[in-house]
């Protein structure tokens, strides 16, 4: 592990293999020892765990995961990292590197085939330019017990946000509907090569067995949520009327009042249970 956290050794490693960082891929490699240790510990990784890692970089987190997990499958887009990873992960029989785009993977099939017989989970230092689509895909796959990942701190705060805060939005509610998110710890810029211009944070998303509340039509619920936050400075009546397009302003107004809310309320102050109530009321219109 020392060679993966020594900056001079890392630079020599990358130079030896002719590697050059790609700005378009958002490459910021993890190069400190304590972060992989805390991620592995926080995720509860043990010999029963089958871990999907996304963007292994030079293998700093991969190496630590392999010491605890039953198996680690790491998906890397940049094929120029192949000789680097071959060197840094040499001899780790429980690690498999797949080269390809994580957003083009059939995640359910990958988990079923590569992590069979193990508890599937995700641990990763996510490329910041694809954080939201990757998390969306992982959550929708609905086959991972937990997702423990490093993201920009502002994204972590948005995911964990409460109703009425500036960070609260449609993505917060999507993640919180499917998982129980927890912001674990911050990671400073000097833990990466090259150093990003933002603070990072590690979050854990624990898959829910059941949604936080009952709703008649989940698709309609998220149409309502997207409409409410698509024009978040408008009143909920106006935002839903414009955003849904299938209900009159008076129908929307009646539903909101029937749920016990004031006519001029905004969606940004509503909890998920309250969005469920409005969604269910709209079904009868």
Briefly describe each language-model feature range.
Residues 1-227, 254-257, 268, 277, ...:
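Catalytic cores of RNA-modifying enzymes
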Residues 241-246:
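Short helix-coil junctions and helix-kink-helix linkers
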Residues 249-252:
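Short amphipathic alpha-helix in the helical subdomain of ABC transporter nucleotide-binding domains
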Residues 261-262:
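Primarily EF-hand calcium-binding motifs
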